[in-house]
């Protein structure tokens, strides 16, 4: 739009800058979520995916994907803490359905059911809750091998009794054949703080550029309104 006096106002430019700032705010939110999750067990970072049409779609052109790379594995000394060196997810039966998670901090109840920290059953490769055939005197009598096979020491027979395999699957629900299970370890997030901080810079720079466009167009709009008022 141009009126007498040569003042130009681009409505589309203002709308585009608003949409862009909205998208960049959401991207910053994802980065902040990743940084916040740095020290969380089983946390996986989110990667923003920006559509080629985001300029027109705004926030509807933004999506995200989960980075499924393994995180940092650290010893915990708790035999019921289970981590995976390869990709995959444990299956947990919740009231809302089966949940996939990398958080392998488990515990036993009084009858030998293997549970997560929220008392939800851990599922086997057969899709059933894992229950130990005998109740161990302590957690050190529970053995989990690299394939995810769970066993428990039976004092009476002096041998290990099988309790099944952990139901480890990929994001599509397909069985993972070589999860490389680590007993007595926790897996912390796969977030690399340096990468997240580096990712902030271009987002902030783009946000500031669009903010300047918005302020310029907003100023021009005020001038247009003022001149239209003077002409009436």
Residue ranges and their predicted role:
Residues 1-232:
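Amphipathic alpha-helical polymerization modules
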